[in-house]
Regions:
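Membrane-interface interhelical linkers
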Residues: 1-67, 73-85, 132-146, 179-216, ...
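Hydrophobic/small/kink-forming positions within alpha-helical transmembrane segments
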Residues: 13-18, 45, 66, 70-74, ...
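Juxtamembrane helix-start motifs in multi-pass secondary transporters
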Residues: 32-35, 88, 173-174, 234
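Hydrophobic transmembrane alpha-helices of multi-pass small-molecule transport proteins
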Residues: 41-44, 101-105, 114-132, 260-269
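Hydrophobic alpha-helical transmembrane segments in multi-pass integral membrane proteins
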Residues: 44-54, 100-116, 153-170, 214-232
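Alpha-helical transmembrane segments of multi-pass integral membrane proteins
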Residues: 121-122, 126, 143-161, 178-182, ...
């Protein structure tokens, strides 16, 4: 893997952690997530107007991915209401490789090597380490459950998009339609928070939509990198975002227990 591709993947990882930090710091996270979704619709609309259609077979996967993304947004917002960025994000992202491996075993009949089971075990240890004190007192169970649910959704839409993009015949078109269909997520969240939305200052609108643009850019960089490097290597390096999120949590959001949480994040990576 070339140095330029490594830099692109690390940039994507950092950007993903940044837009999650934007959501975490918002006063009304549901409203902000609606704006993040809207921020993906705008460039998506431009792209679908100039790119060829993906294959008809892939549209069911685009729609299914959109539905799972709605659940993902809902759980992510709730998780950040209850827990720190440096706890929620590493758990939600950290369990994805383990879950995808399990889906491959259960649905595709792949046999997991012993090293993969060791990796899954380390992820579990990392999750327990990041939440140890809270779990002992009982206050971290809600955060853990929501973070795990968020990670479950990520693993499902990753699997769906992995199949769908192969059927699409055009990676950019698949990506663009996925972004454009966030219109439904933005619409549902916007209707739910319609009174709040009309009263928001322009600064909040700008921050939320910027988060959407950052999110879409991060995903686009990963898609680009996958054209030039093995998928497994890209995915593994992509998970360095959990370290970026932990560092943002400590240096920017002033969250505590950063040494233990950073150690847990590194362990999960």
């Amino acid at each position: 893997m070339s140095a330029s591709i490594i830099a692109i993947i690390l940039s994507a990882a950092m950007l993903h952690a940044v837009w999650n930090a934007i959501v975490k710091t918002a006063v009304d996270r549901t409203t902000t997530l609606g704006l993040v979704a809207l921020g993906q619709v705008l460039p998506g609309a431009v792209m679908v107007s100039i790119l060829p259609l993906p294959s008809i077979e892939s549209f069911i996967y685009i729609v299914l991915s959109t539905l799972v993304h709605f659940a993902y947004f809902f759980l992510l917002g709730r998780a950040y209401q209850h827990g720190d960025l440096s706890v929620v994000y590493p758990i939600a992202r950290g369990i994805v490789p383990a879950l995808v491996s399990l889906w491959a075993m259960l649905l595709l009949g792949e046999v997991l090597p012993a090293l993969a089971w060791v990796g899954i075990g380390l992820i579990i240890v990392g999750i327990l380490l990041s939440n140890w004190k809270a779990l002992r007192s009982g206050v971290g169970k809600t955060t853990l459950g929501l973070a795990l649910g968020t990670g479950f959704c990520i693993s499902i839409y990753s699997l769906v998009d992995g199949v769908g993009v192969r059927l699409s015949g055009n990676t950019l078109s698949y990506w663009a339609w996925g972004a454009f269909l966030h219109l439904f997520i933005a619409g549902l969240l916007g209707w739910h928070k319609r009174k709040t939305m009309v009263q928001l200052p322009l600064k909040i609108w700008a921050v939320g939509i910027t988060g959407g643009l950052v999110s879409m850019t991060a995903y686009g960089l990963v898609l680009y990198a996958k054209n030039f490097a093995p998928l497994g290597a890209v995915s593994a390096l992509r998970e360095t975002s959990v370290i970026f999120a932990t560092l943002i949590g400590f240096f920017v959001l002033k969250e505590g227990n950063w040494k233990r949480r950073l150690g847990a994040a590194v362990l999960m990576v």
